[in-house]
């Protein structure tokens, strides 16, 4: 019987460097929400890619950041660091410049023996690739990376090169997931994340991270899925911002989310949304656990 190869690769980096976009590009479909806002990803999400006799389970993580003032930030840091345990490869994503937060993330890797690939993302914004040479020289002096790959997660340029390099580190093992499975997350989780993505994209900087989404109904019928969700905010003033004048903004969120859900689930979706206030949820450990955040 022909051997198979299977293992885990964690995708890490500071917030807003394109980790989720990279995961979606590697998988060839969207499973992790994206926006221009830092810290869009709050949970550890597994993306499964099976190619012939190789299966890679990519671990998308929240952005690692030095600021731990808020309880929610500490939760996300613990989630990201936890993803580094027992993986076979680490993909460290940066932008085409080195920042102090990148150095802070790198410090978290120096005690880990797992091979680290450095990805320089967003090179589609660079006119002359020669501009990257000083950065490559600098980062090469900081750490013995397995490979340094400039790429564009947005366009897919050179993503295949990274994927082939990751494949070479996967140990011989049975597949952990059926070949057709693409994520470990439930349909309910995907529905709530789609809603949160549409909120973050429409709200601009008005309510950066003071919202969460929970489902109160998810019912699959023969031809339709019925979903009811609550959008939680921290202050009464934020409730009005989310709803918008005459309910216009909430209606747009619902329409955009429903269209994405119908693509994901392959059937019609009936979606109802409510907005409620839960004061201080982002700094309350009990409330964070209730809203699905992991230790």
From Swiss-Prot:
CDD domains: Era, KH-II_Era. It is a peripheral membrane protein. SUPFAM superfamilies: P-loop containing nucleoside triphosphate hydrolases (SSF52540), Prokaryotic type KH domain (KH-domain type II) (SSF54814). This is GTPase Era. Transmembrane segments: none annotated. Residues 60-63 are annotated as: G3. One of its GO terms (cellular component) is plasma membrane. Coiled coil: none annotated. The keyword ATP-binding does not apply. Residues 13-20 are annotated as: G1. The gene is era.
